[in-house]
Amino acid sequence: MAGALRRTMVYLGLAESDDEYISDETPRPRDTPQSAGGSSAAVSESGSTSVARRSPEYRAPVTPIKRAPSSREDENELRTITTVHPRSYNDAKSIGEAFRDGTPVIMNVSDMGEAEAKRLVDFAAGLVFALHGSIERVTAKVFLLTPSFVEVRDQGHSDDIDEEPASLEQVEG
């Protein structure tokens, strides 16, 4: 199994070929036809046959390709945060598009009615679940939606924040 993996890596140019890893049992293309006896023979112009010699395969020199920088490195340098003050559930599209593009979203639902705000928060919770992000309550009606690659650091001011965040149903006002 390791031999097959090694040959595949050599074929794809991911590893350099070592002659000790290549066995004689490896099928190779042959330029000469096989005789009925099963041995390979070459027919010369004079009609006599001679045993064909195996010549080493020519391998072109391979230059390794350098990987392009990952887009994750660019995402680590966060430059924008989208703040949305939705007035109705119809504004959910702008929240979803920004979050899907990898931008953290601050969603302030204080201008909405309780039922519509709950519906929008449920949408946001499903959105962050589907895209492996997270949602945090900042204040009673302000939520932070963060993509999976964004880390939110707490500065240790837990005195002002309740230990367990209240849901929209518990908050009046």
UniProtKB/Swiss-Prot annotation:
GO terms for biological process: division septum assembly; FtsZ-dependent cytokinesis. It is found in: Cytoplasm. Residues 35-52 have a biased composition (Low complexity). Residues 17-85 are annotated as: Disordered. The keyword Chaperone does not apply. Keywords: Cell cycle, Cell division, Cytoplasm, Septation. The keyword Acetylation does not apply. Homodimer. Interacts with FtsZ. Belongs to the SepF family. This is Cell division protein SepF. It comes from Kocuria rhizophila (strain ATCC 9341 / DSM 348 / NBRC 103217 / DC2201). The lineage of its organism: Bacteria, Bacillati, Actinomycetota, Actinomycetes, Micrococcales. The gene is sepF.
